[in-house]
Amino acid sequence: MMSNMTGSEPLAAQARQLVQAGEWQQAADVLRQLIGEVTGVAAGQLTINRDQYSLNSLNGTVTLDDGRALFFKYHNEEGEDKTIEEYYNAELLRESGFRVDVPVYACGEPGRQILMYTLRHDRRMADICRDIEQQQAWDQEAEIEEAQRRADRDILTHTLPTLKPGLVSAVAAEPVHQLFYHRLISPENPEITAGLGGRVARFYVGKTFRLEDEELEWQTLSNLRWVINGVTYQHSLRQLFTEAGIRLAPAALAGHGVITAHGDAHNANVWYDTSEEIPQLVSFDPAFAGRNIPALLAEIKATFHNIFAHPLWLYEPSRCGELYKVTVMRRGDTLYVDHNWQLTPLRAAFLRDKGEEYWQPLLAQLARRGWLPPHWQRIFRLAMFCCPTLVLDLRAGGFSGHTQTSSALGLAMAMMLGSEPVEDTDEFSDWLAGISPAEQPL
């Protein structure tokens, strides 16, 4: 495997490729070299976590020869070495009062980006939530829900003082767009329509989709209308991707207010800190943090990944068949999908609290300042739509281990988030209506 890599290839990229090839020990050796170079201290025992939540990154633990134990995490995003100058931004979050774990080492060189923290023995919030759901330990839910609610309230408290008008140049420079717009475009191929490039081209365009008993080509599937659990939706997949390529462009978002934010603070990037009498949520790995993040994007990743990605279907697709019954049938230009997915009590509470404690007051403040556009729900929906479709290849047999069941469910979930019902309603539409400022048209 090593013979296929050039000596000039960045160490972080080498480690990522080795892990993908199942060469865990060689990957650990490469990371040990990188960590030794960054810290100036030889790295000893190193363990890479086999982690279902780290979809575009690696993390693990390492013991340095001076006895210190560290937790490391790094991203290996396509194109990041060309676009990110300041990759880690924990200090700017701490300066604004956010609870954030500050790394003891940070390297921002292209292809060598890595964060190292003092090793904690706290658990990640994502793991605690998964255990509650897997064990159906609903008696533990109240404490975790309250911690999340406090965190949502605290995030808003520190966010609102940073709200300001946006400048196109400053907004466009923010790394958060790597999670959305940059995954929709192919700058090297300008003839590709925005929204159908980037990961969309890599994952979906021209590919075959196996959705339970149906097998459809992209050209067909992308133009179908969807009826999900009896609810007819307005858009096709192609329409959602191309609209996202317009509405999520940095210049299109710059006029709607910007804030200081983490940008990717879903619960796999959050510690459940029990060092104080009252448990607190502490974020880490602020790879996409900034001072000019569009206000309508800042908590989208947390809203999707903490709530709609569970249980199992996104992060553990091979287990999807244990929980879900999904049927798919095409009739003419319409795809009918029925499934039994629903929010667990824990995720339903998270959705309610995120709306009440964060989104509702933020949207109201944007409306008062005249920065909330009439089409804000389209921006919100399209960003939510991009979370599952762009973080992983949702095709069965694609790059991410998805099955015919999880693929059908995942695309139906994305459609429900991205498109309004034609006549009926659904849980997400009701939630959006509930957080809407009264003076704003839907």
Residue positions per predicted region:
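ATP-dependent phospho-/nucleotidyl transfer catalytic cores
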Residues: I128-H262, D273-P279
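A conserved alpha-helical element in kinase catalytic cores
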Residues: K73-R112, D139-A151
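Conserved catalytic-loop position in the HRD/HxD motif
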Residues: D264, N269
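ATP-binding glycine-rich loop module of kinase domains
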Residues: N56-I84
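ATP/Mg2+ or Mg2+-diphosphate-binding catalytic cores
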Residues: T344-L442
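Short pocket-lining segment of the protein kinase catalytic domain that shapes the ATP-binding cleft
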Residues: L115-R123
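ATP-binding glycine-rich phosphate-binding loop
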Residues: E23, G36-D65
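Active-site activation/catalytic loop segments of kinase-like enzymes and analogous catalytic loops
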Residues: L93, L281, A289, I293-L366, ...
